[in-house]
């Protein structure tokens, strides 16, 4: 029966055969069996709970970055080199703090190219780099927002609540690692275990717009801090960093550990390998450095600038799986 039907279709005029193929494709598409080409990517769908004008700032800069990335074929670079290429393109961007505090109650992934802090600098550089690999052209702000959400929120999903965002780098590293999005080679590089009692968010809650407007979230934030305090966090003491620099890679995310007993880390940036060592690219708040994104100096030299700099954590992002919904793979907040 089916063979006869197939031969009957083949005998029809080309327009009829074309319509038949379209019907079959649409059927398979609805069944989730048809390939979508570039659309069948690792980029989850982004659904904003706030207007795009609120969650995405700097569209012209985004368009310029996309144009440059295509011209210089950044998509062909390994993930680390790609992340660093994006970071270098953002050099000179002004340092601006609290850019994630965009509403009194509703939480959403957001991107602001007009101003970056140390965390959003690495985060946007990485998300943009992943976007270039996860999709073949037609890059949209929604794609970047989706990949920021994948990195920034617990299990890769923002539920509209402030506490779905991870507010501590250590949790981001653990959560993304558990979902197969990164590795943490710090321990293998000779790292030592750190012990901290995290309390930054509850101690400084009035500094955060969402917590000021809804203090009822403080008890749950305290519970999150307890969980982060219990994570197995390793760091490489600054006295040893120069000796292990050769093992670092361009695009590694470098978190600076601190001596303060209420926090593991105080700063973060991107590693860039140069002939004379591995340099630290970061968004700095220092006025003598211009309060902007800079390619500073060797990481080991940067650590020597302050007694508060205790060491480093090395976080190595990986390429996104394709086309697996990594956001839903259960894993393990500034």
Question: How would you describe each model-predicted region?
Answer:
Residues 23-32:
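Bacterial N-terminal signal peptides
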Residues 36-40:
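Boundary at the C-terminal end of the N-terminal hydrophobic targeting segment
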Residues 42-120, 125:
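Cationic-aromatic interfacial patches
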Residues 90-231, 273, 282-285:
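Acidic/His-rich structured neighborhood in mature extracellular/periplasmic domains
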Residues 247-248:
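Short, well-ordered loop/turn sites that connect or cap secondary structure elements
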Residues 254-320, 328:
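C-terminal soluble interaction/assembly domains
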